[in-house]
Amino acid sequence: MQSNAEMTVTPASRPRLTRIDIARGVALIAMAIYHFGWDLEFFGYMAPATTAHGGWKLFARCIASSFLFLVGFSLVLAHGRAIRWEAMGKRLLQIGAAAAAISAVTFYMSPDNFIFFGILHQIALASVLGLLFLRLPSVVTLIVAAFVITAPFYAQSDIFNQMWLAWIGLSTVPPRSNDYVPLFPWFGAVLIGIAAARIFKRFNWLPILSGGIKPAFLQKPFTFIGRH
């Protein structure tokens, strides 16, 4: 996710948006809970495919959506006025290295279901593509988001069934992977985050996000997790 420096574009003029940190912290905790369930399933303590159906599947999709929404929102906060190429490049290298490591490790452990385009791969790609929307009107970004989210319902084709095109997300046969977060429809969540951040900036709503939460004792741990 975004670094501290990237989250605060002009620290002297705007307080840190604590509720963004808290939201990220909650998402990270939710991700840990889901992966704990996945581990229980993997080691035989839960029935096979438990986390791939029903409430667990919905839980996973909510987690991914929240992460990607925050990626888009934070992209505007960090680069909305001017793209900070050095910070962007450093962040992409970090995320790209982590994504490559996950692909390598999962290929070694489970070659039939390895993670070739998971959440980190999506974040890396979306962080680059999202730059194209930083100056566009929010309504245009939301229209594109709607197209991206709905495309898998009407734009699927056998052409995309080839493994090297699976990252796009328009194949007619879903590829096997332990974590699959393709461009379509998931980039749509990033675009919604970008549009939301631009709307918040336009109407001067960002100060709303600088407050805390109740109960207060949860604020510090959630904020710490979200920042680090």
Regions found by a protein language model. Name each.
Residues 1-228:
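Alpha-helical transmembrane segments and their immediate juxtamembrane cytosolic regions
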